[in-house]
Structure formats: C-alpha cells, structure tokens
Amino acid sequence: MKKICFIAQFPPPMHGLSKAVETLYNSNLNSEIDPHGKFKFEKVDITNNRNFIKNLLKISRSKADLFYFTISQTKGGNLRDLVIFKLLELQHKKCLIHLHGGYYRQLVDNDMAGWQRKANYKAIKKLSGAIVLSKSLKKIFEGMIDDDKIFVVENCVDDQYLLTDQEIEEKLKALENEKVLHVLWLSNFIRSKGYPFVLEMAKAEKERVDAGGEKRFHFDFAGKFFEESEKDYFESYIKENGLEEYVTYHGIVGGEQKRELLKKCYIFALPTRYPNEGQPISILEAMGNGMFIITTDHAGIPDIVEDGVNGIVMNKEYDAVNCYRKLLNEHELFLFIVRNRKKIKKFYCQNEYIRKMKDFFED
C-alpha cells in the first residue's frame, strides 16, 4: 500500500487551507478511516513552528512514498519550507506541493533577497509537481517548473456544509415571502478581505431606510478577529453609524450554527483584495448553499464567479455605495441561486476534490 506523508497545516486554527487539508486527510482514501482506502496516510503538522526540529526528525524518519506539502506564502515560512525541501532532496524523496493561495510568485520575485529567490527556483524545479487552485493561478509556477508538472485542483465544499436538495427547495420557496434579505460575511476579520466594505453597504441601507424606504437587507457577520484593532474598528463603526439594527455578529461559527446561517442568508459578500488569496472556500460554500455572490476580480476568484452570471464581480473602481445600489436593483436572485447551486454540485463537491487528489496520489 502506498504511503503518503502530509506536511501541512492542520486545524486549529480553522481556515481555508487547514479545512482543505483536514477534508483530504480524513477522506475515504485514508486506510485508517476506510478499510477500503487505497493509501496509508501519516502527518507532520507544521502549524506551530516551535515543533520545527521535531518535525524535521519525523520527515527524515518517514518511509513515505510521496510527501504532500502545503507550502507557505510568507518569507519566514518559506525559510522553513526551503529546509524541508533540502531534506527531502538529500533523501531522494518524491514531493508534490499544493499552493492554497495566490501570492507565492510575488513573494519570491519581489519580496525576497536574491539568495532566497534563487533557492526557491532551484527547489521548485526538482519537485514531482505543483498544484494550484485554478487555471488562472498556473502562471505562479510557470518558468519555475515544467508546465506539464503544474496541475489544477479546485477547492471543494465539505458535505457537512452543503444543504440538501430539500433544504434548497425550502429556501427558494421562502424567498418569495422574504421582505428582508440576509447578507452574509463569513471569513477571518482581516481588513483586506473587505469587511469594512460590507459595513459601508450596511450604512447605505440604513441611510436609505432613514430617508423613508423599507428595510430590504440585514448584514450577518461571522468569523475570527486575529487582531484586537480589527475588532475595535468593527464595533466602533457599528456604534458610530447606529447600525445595531442592521448588523449582527455571530462570532466563530461551525457545525449546525454555520449550517443555519448558510440556510438563512441569500447573499454572500467577500469583496477581498487579500494578497494571499487563492480561491476562497467560503465563496464555494455560499454558491453551493444557494446564495448570490458579491466579490472581486482578485486572484483565482474570476475562475469560479462570473459577473452577471453568479453575482457581482467588482474591479478596483467599484465602491460600496455603487455595489449596494446594484444589489438593490437586482430582481433575479432566484435564477442566480439555482445556477450557483448546480455549478457547485457538478464541479466543486467533496467527492470530486477527493477523486482528483486520488489521481495525483496514484501517479
């Protein structure tokens, strides 16, 4: 039985990368999870750099046939990765990397000293392959490794967070009578991911209602604050603009609480310009659970969301007020919801993701 060693970031904390890794590791490919699994998985959790030496010893002692490595997009993390690459090279180990983001090439070409840049080009060239999240992100590794060794495996929606067909039917039926539509922000609270933009949309809604209009939207936020300054900004903006009746913060959600939010909300907003962005799983989850998408033409997002087809895809010239007005005038939510649901079930379900990864592990 083929042995595969995961060198990756496992939860906690939970984010797009760790979620994808956990889904794959706990899949039916793993013989410890499923007796019919085709592979023996082992893991080296590189989330905590304090375990660096211990992790190097684990890697050096591993008898795995293939090392599956989710690489970093920071200079410090990359130094760790270079040491791991060198160790695998010295031991003549096969290594397949998976980039869960879109910033790596910019990091290497623009942010690194010459020696570190050269070390990356040299290390990547010797790999068995490099996986990216979408077609438009293949350019990240072009010129670093042979084109036929650059592969695409899109993210997926975990089965546990995908509403059933019956639940979607009920959601569509309820839409006919919904006077106030819920807009969902579900991500980590990082300024460049765009949560201030969504707060501005909430402010625009309040101003319209104050001028005599009926309330049309309520804004639901969920996710983790990594910095106290982000939490202060969020809470201060709500208080200063009197948005208490327009904004609800649900904290960090998971399990049934998350499913209920996905069921309740009809619009998903992630106007991100986050430098490390790849292909946000949260957007796929929203589409799969029957939501109209508001996002940007950033990183690998245009590969999954098309303006006017799946929602609103904004360039850098858009502002929150213009986006809000466009949403206000959108009267075909039903069609977007049905279209987005079909797309995810066909191309981005958990089984499809695992099937693609199985093919690479077998090769």
Regions found by a protein language model. Name each.
Residues 331-362:
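A charged, aromatic-enriched C-terminal amphipathic alpha-helix characteristic of glycosyltransferases
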Residues 186, 217-233, 251-252:
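Glycosyltransferase donor-sugar binding loop
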Residues 263-277, 291:
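Acidic donor-binding loop of glycosyltransferase active sites
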Residues 120-166:
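Donor nucleotide-sugar binding/catalytic pocket of nucleotide-sugar-dependent glycosyltransferases
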